[in-house]
Structure formats: C-alpha cells, structure tokens
C-alpha cells in the first residue's frame, strides 16, 4: 500500500532525511528517505545506492543517533598556502544532508577536510558559513555582503573559494568582479549534482577550485567541470561565463572569450588558455555600492515599449535590452528609447548571446544609436545588467555612460573570439 | 574636403544608391554609393569591389538609366517540382539593391533565377514579394498574414520557401509551425551577409533551401549554413532552432534536438539526422489566431515580481518565465505566481536554453509547481512564448494549460538530447 498524501505534503516528504525500515517487493529494506523527484518513495541504502519504490509498506521509523562528527582537528601544514572557503549554500554544500539525516551542513574546515581529504594536500583550509540559501534567492544585497567578507578574507589568505548554487553563480561572479579589485584569486565553485549521487561533481570541482585559488591569478573566476567526464575543470573569467545547460556537469561556458585555464584531474596540472590578471597585478580595493533600480528586458516581436516607460516612471535609470541579432528592437521603440535615454543609461546587448553587438550596420541599429542607446559590445546581457547596477551605484549617469563602453574587469574583449 | 552632415543625415546617406563620380587620393573614382557602416564614404566600383574614403571631393551625381532587367522569360521545365518563394525582406532580399542603385528589389522569379541560375535545375520557381521589412519589425500580425499566404501557396506547389531577415526568423518559423499543419516542406531561409559581400551566404542558403523544399519533409524548417565554410547547410525544425550568434554564418543551431538533416554543398545530397514529419504525413490546415497579450519575462536576481502584476492588470493571461537553472525564480515570487496562475497560464522555461526544466528537484521548484506554474520541458523560451500566443488565440485557458505540456509541432522532445 502506498501511503496517501496529506494535501501537498506526501508521506515521502514528511519522512525525508529519516531512517526507516520498509517492506517492498517481498523484501525488507532499510535506509534514509531521500527527496523524491518522481513521486516514487526513494531510499538511500547503506551501500550508498538509491532505490525507488512505487509500492511499499512502512514498517518502522528508526531513531538515529545524533550526529557526532568526531573529526580529527586539522593541523596547519607548513609551506602550504592559506585558503578561505566561504559557503553560500547550493548543491555543493548539501553534501552532508542525507548522509546523516541532518539537513543543514555545519560547514567547518574539519568537516570539509574529512569529506575531501585531498584538499589538505593543496592548501590549509579556513571555512566560513555565510549563507545557506538556494542561489535563485541570492539578491544584490547578498552580493554586497559577500564582497565584504571576501575582501576581508583576502587580507590574510592567498586565495578565497566561494561555494555557491549554480543557478545564479555567474551573476554573483560578475557582481564580485566589478565590486572587488583583487590581487589574488577569488574562485566560485558549485556542483550540478549533489554529493550523495554517484555522478556528483562536488569533490572534483572543489579540488580544482582549491588549485586555482593557489595559482597565479588575480581576478574573480568560476571553476567547474569542463566536460561530462571527470577529466578536467575549466577556469572561466567571472564576467565572461554563463550557465548554458540546466543539468549537465559542464554547463558553465565562457562566452565570447576563451576560458582562462584548464586544470586536469586528478593531476591538477594547469594549462593557461587565455590572458588573465596575474597575482599581485591589481591592488585590493572594494567598491561595493549597487543600484537596485536597473532592469534587463528581453525583446521579442510584438513586445510594446511601454515596459520601458513603466520602469522609467518607477525611477529606473539603468536599462539593459536583450535585442535581436546585432542588437535590434522594433522601429516603434525608437521614440520611447530617445525619451528614456535623456536621463538614463540604456545598453543594447544581444539575445544571440554569442557575438558582438553592432548597431552601425542596419537602419534600425543606426536609429537606436541616434536615440542615445549604447552598444554593449560583446558583453553578456547578465553581465551588462550587473555592470550597470555597479556603475550607477558608484558613479554619475554621465560617468556610467562612458565607463559602460570600456572594459573594467575583462568583460569586453577587444575582438570577438569565434 | 569631406561634406558635412545635415543633422543626422550625412551626405553619404543622402547619396546612397546613386551613381557618383568623385576625386579622392588624387584619382577619379566612379561607382554606386553604398550604406556606410563606419562613417566612411563607400563606393561600389564597377568591378564589384567596395572602396571606402575618409576624404573625398564630390564631382558629379550621374543620372542612372532606369533599371531594365531584360531578363529572359523563365520556361517551366517538365518534371521539376513547383516551388513558391515568398520574400519578407531582410539581408537575403537585399541582393539587388546596390547592383543597380535600386533600393527595393522587384523580387520576380526571373530576377531570382538570373541571380542564382542553379535554382532552375532544382525546381520551377514562382515568386511573391510579401514584405520588404527588416525582421526586427516583424509582428504577430505579419505572422498571421504570412501563414495565410503560405497556406494558399501550399495548395498548388510542392514546397514553399520564405526568405526572411535572420534576427527574428526563428520566431516566425515557430509561429508558422503552430499555425500551419502542412503536408509539404515550408522552408525559412536567410543570409547573415548580404549578397554584395564576397562572403555572402545568400546563394548557397537559397539553393539548399530549394533542395529542402523539394524533399520528403512535411513541416516548417529553417535552412542555414551549418559551418563557417561553404560546405553544408543544416535543416532545423522550426520549433527547435535559435539564432545563437550575432554575425556568424552558422549562427542558427538546433537546441535540445538534432537538426533534421544536412544538405551538402554544392552536391546538394541530403543526409537525415533525426526524425521528421514526412511529406503527406499531416493534412493541410490553418489555425491562425494569435493572442497578443502574452509576455516573456527573463528573471534575474533582484527582479521584483511586480512585473507579473503589471502585465496581469493589463489583461495578460499568458506568461512565459525564463527562470534560472532547472526553472527557478526567487522564493518571494511564489505568492504573486499563485495569484496570477488562478486565471492565467504561466510556463516556466530556462535561461540556460540548453537542457530541460525540472521543478521537482529543489524546494523552490516544488513551490513553483504548487503555485500552478507549468514546466516548459525542453522548449526554448521564445518557442514557449509563441506557443502560448497560439494556444490562447485558439483555445480556452484550461485547454491551453493541458496542451502547452504536450508536443504540438515537435517542440517538446521525449528525452533531452545532449
């Protein structure tokens, strides 16, 4: 018999994380109840495998011993660089959740080292749990707080790692790229599959991120799987990277730029693939204000330019448009654009994502430029959005109009890479 | 001396398309004035080359003989299939513009055949100039008119080709995919480089499109360069294709599906790469209403859900959200989503573009589903938008909620292709 649901909450969800004994298919099974994505009742058995059941009989909910880590104290190794790991939540931090039934990770250095012991051969780890939130809930306020914590950590560590949910990791990486001028590596890392799954990318990504954090890098980067195998990670510039797949482990790709480098696994040997800010090249500096009233609008055939008026009337002075092709919107947007451009910064990007905006080729584009719109060059729409939040938070409208065209953190390449 | 500009209109633009004689670099040049993308004064010389000048002296504006094509009359070849070419404008149709100085192409069958004579070996061409507009100016009204013209043409032709600007070609292809059930091929084709440039893709794309229009296909497709070389075109399903580069000739890619086929050039041999609707498989049927009050909203960290209320209060009942990752928005959107879902259809897609939406994995996703949002599976956001315009134009809200989850024109693949 399959237990019925109470309203929206199924039996399986009420038992999530608990140890149970059930009868199914004529046998007895014991294990931890896992979140069910399919409507099945899923158990993690002691051998590590997950098994799903359509029909089962619940025999017993077992008491679990309170989680006592008993982890050995970490001893600092001489000669290894100090690296700070700041956790913000997401799949990569959900490691411990269903192993013990505990839903929230403690995220101590000892815990991380016991999960991924190879880390201690690369660096001396400090750990800090800043947030435990899903990355779709990250807000500009969180970026500011995170930037301040990273700024502080950079003063007495050789590098900083930020574990982050993958949904908005590239937004956060772009935000920190603008807010922080850093002489040391700041490495975002996440996982597409949680650590309780055999295909998890959490440990390998973290090891490669630790390697990156000790390397000759002086900028904010994202380090994630470079292929669907466990053979290498890629290090992407924080302002040129995008999540381009909902579930693949190699979902993160550099767009309109080569990745900065490649870190082979398990050798952790590094190959540089592009130019980069080097360690010590820039001074440590925090410029951490962000203007919230900036909006990204994706154009489509038939979309009325009223949406520009709507945001403008609410006090928005920063607009990023995701236009078509080389950077176009319908001709009937031009009048509204001209009015909005009088006291606002409007940046044109392309929903093609790859390639460079060029509004000098066709009539519509030239009209858009005459209206006062600024070409976003080869910037990703998401990056242009955050750049504008940062510019309008720290500079005047006129300064922002000049600076948005120029590369601040490597977000504009001089020529487009194919 | 470089002629000064009058307001926004430069001398070069006033002369565009006219034949002139100038003095520059100590020599005399004669040719047709081309649109200038760089601020230079550009002449197309009689040998076909374009030359740009920074400084020049205008000597004479020459009268041009009225354009007399003197084209041989096309004779229908027995045994070749009849194909209708409908022109809507865009780069591919700009072929004739600056060859003669005429700004608008006549777009007769004779003209096309004289430009691309190999066409007459593939099919007997009929031609119709429906629009001459840049594709960023296409509107849902144009899709309806276009669908009606194609519907009519399909009755007495073996296939239909639509020449179209590339900016929104994939939107138009998706629109016709839903509006037209077709037993014959309907082939969209465009060019990324206009025919007066040596690197133009116009002729090859048109020849491959003609081949596709005579093949065993019974659906709406897009036929464009498959690589940056002139070696093959790909035939993409109209509801699985997207322009993914601002300028590359192979900008169009199938997303979350394999292309239907590959047409080698110049052999025009066809290789099928995926399933397809076959010729004669479906009845000819036109379902051509579209609801305009449907909107696509791209989510980003910090975006307020007020935007949903704004459109809802204006009578919008169709919403496509471009969420993050597997299909997420911030948790503080849930209450608004629940209210909007009461009388509207809200579809979740992913700004990752590649991969499938799955809101059953994480808490936020499950909350989104409970609010009444429907998973857009592996549909592109743009395709989900147009599908919803079509569903709400022709069916009730309740019917639309059911149909949006099911594949109508091949827009949802049973499993995601990697």
Swiss-Prot record, chains A, B:
GO molecular function: asparaginase activity; ATP binding; glutaminyl-tRNA synthase (glutamine-hydrolyzing) activity
Enzyme Commission number: 6.3.5.-
Keyword Transferase: no
Top EC class of this enzyme: ligase
Coiled-coil annotated residue ranges, if any: none
Active-site residue list: 91, 166, 167, 243
Catalytic activity as recorded in UniProt: L-glutamyl-tRNA(Gln) + L-glutamine + ATP + H2O = L-glutaminyl-tRNA(Gln) + L-glutamate + ADP + phosphate + H(+)
CDD domains xrefs: GatD
Domain Asparaginase/glutaminase, chain residue ranges per copy: 81-407
A single GO BP: regulation of translational fidelity
UniProt keyword annotations, A-Z: ATP-binding, Ligase, Nucleotide-binding, Protein biosynthesis
Xref: HAMAP family: GatD
Biological function: Allows the formation of correctly charged Gln-tRNA(Gln) through the transamidation of misacylated Glu-tRNA(Gln) in organisms which lack glutaminyl-tRNA synthetase. The reaction takes place in the presence of glutamine and ATP through an activated gamma-phospho-Glu-tRNA(Gln). The GatDE system is specific for glutamate and does not act on aspartate.
Subunit structure: Heterodimer of GatD and GatE.
Family the UniProt entry places it in: Belongs to the asparaginase 1 family. GatD subfamily.
Protein name in the entry: Glutamyl-tRNA(Gln) amidotransferase subunit D
Lineage summary: Archaea, Methanobacteriati, Methanobacteriota, Archaeoglobi, Archaeoglobales
């Amino acid at each position: 018999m399959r237990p019925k649901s109470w309203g929206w909450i199924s039996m399986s969800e009420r038992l999530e994380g608990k140890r149970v004994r059930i009868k199914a298919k004529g046998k007895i099974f014991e294990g931890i109840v896992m979140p069910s994505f399919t409507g099945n009742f899923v158990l993690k058995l002691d051998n590590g495998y997950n098994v799903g059941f359509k029909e089962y009989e619940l025999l017993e909910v077992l008491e679990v011993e309170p989680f006592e880590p008993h982890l050995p104290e970490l001893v600092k190794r001489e000669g290894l660089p100090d690296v700070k790991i700041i956790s913000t939540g997401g799949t990569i931090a959900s490691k411990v959740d269903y192993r013990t039934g505990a839903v929230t990770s403690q995220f101590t250095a000892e815990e991380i080292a016991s999960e991924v012991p190879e880390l201690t051969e690369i660096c001396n780890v400090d750990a800090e749990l800043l947030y435990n939130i899903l990355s779709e809930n990250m807000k500009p306020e969180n970026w500011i707080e995170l930037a301040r914590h990273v700024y502080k950590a950079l003063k007495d560590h050789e590098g900083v790692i930020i574990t982050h949910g993958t949904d908005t990791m590239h937004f956060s990486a772009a935000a920190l790229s603008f807010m922080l001028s850093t002489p040391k590596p700041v490495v975002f890392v996440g996982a597409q599959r949680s650590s309780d799954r055999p295909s998890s990318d959490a440990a390998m990504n973290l090891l490669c991120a630790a390697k990156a954090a000790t390397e000759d890098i002086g900028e904010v980067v994202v380090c994630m799987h470079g292929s669907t195998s466990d053979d290498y990670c890629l290090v992407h510039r924080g302002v040129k990277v995008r999540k381009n797949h909902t579930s693949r482990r190699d979902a993160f790709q550099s767009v309109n730029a080569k990745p900065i480098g490649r870190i082979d696994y398990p050798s952790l040997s590094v190959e540089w693939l592009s130019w980069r800010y080097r360690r010590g090249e820039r001074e440590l500096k925090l410029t951490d204000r962000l203007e919230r009233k900036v909006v990204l609008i994706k154009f489509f055939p038939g979309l009325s330019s009223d949406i520009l008026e709507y945001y403008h009337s609410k006090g928005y002075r920063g607009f990023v448009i995701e236009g078509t092709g080389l950077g176009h919107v319908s001709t009937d947007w031009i009048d509204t654009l001209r009015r909005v451009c009088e006291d606002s910064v409007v940046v044109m990007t392309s929903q093609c994502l790859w390639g460079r905006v060029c509004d000098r080729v066709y009539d519509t584009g030239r009209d858009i430029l005459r209206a006062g719109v600024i070409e976003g060059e080869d910037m990703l729409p998401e990056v242009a959005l955050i750049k504008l939040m940062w510019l309008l938070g720290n500079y005047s409208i006129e300064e922002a109009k000049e600076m948005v065209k120029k590369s601040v953190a490597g977000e504009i390449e001089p020529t487009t890479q194919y």
